[in-house]
Amino acid sequence: LLPLDDKTLLEHVICSMQQIFPQVIVSVREPRAGVELSQVRDEQAGSGPLAGLAAGLAKVATPWAFVVACDMPYISSQLVELIYKSRKNHQAVVPVVGGYPQPLAAFYSVSCLDVIRQALAGQDKSLRGVLQQLDVCYVDEAGMNDAALRSFVDLDTPEDYAAAVKNGLFEL
């Protein structure tokens, strides 16, 4: 669990989500000590984010769940609200930034669970493959303000992380 300012990346994301949602569930490969929230283990070990999504959707008490990666500490309530408003009768609402879908900062209906589990049982365990089988509303970045767009700064590489540490969480 990498630290950023006074918290780990996961703690930053959890804190942001707790300000928006009454229930926060952390999907993990293995249980994490020190996380005082409900944790669910991946339904199928080694199957990436799709396994975590399945476990989380199986646990939520609501018809929809917002899913966010733990390496996205800048996630904003503005982004969540914008995506939430686009749900309507879709199965998923996924933002598109720079021409690329962002399936790890998206809303998913629990009605997706069967399709996700079928994918986990098959060869293609990618979220993008699952999205092709769902009724998805894609939300283009054109309607997003700066705070919402900043949500998509993730810390995938050591260089991303080093820049965030150097600049402080709210300076990146």
Identify the function of each model-found stretch.
Residues 1-127, 132-150, 162-171:
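Nucleotide and nucleotide-moiety/phosphate-recognizing core
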Residues 153:
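Dinucleotide-binding Rossmann-like beta1-alpha1 core, especially the glycine-rich loop
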Residues 159:
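Conserved active-site and cofactor/substrate-binding residues in soluble primary-metabolism enzymes
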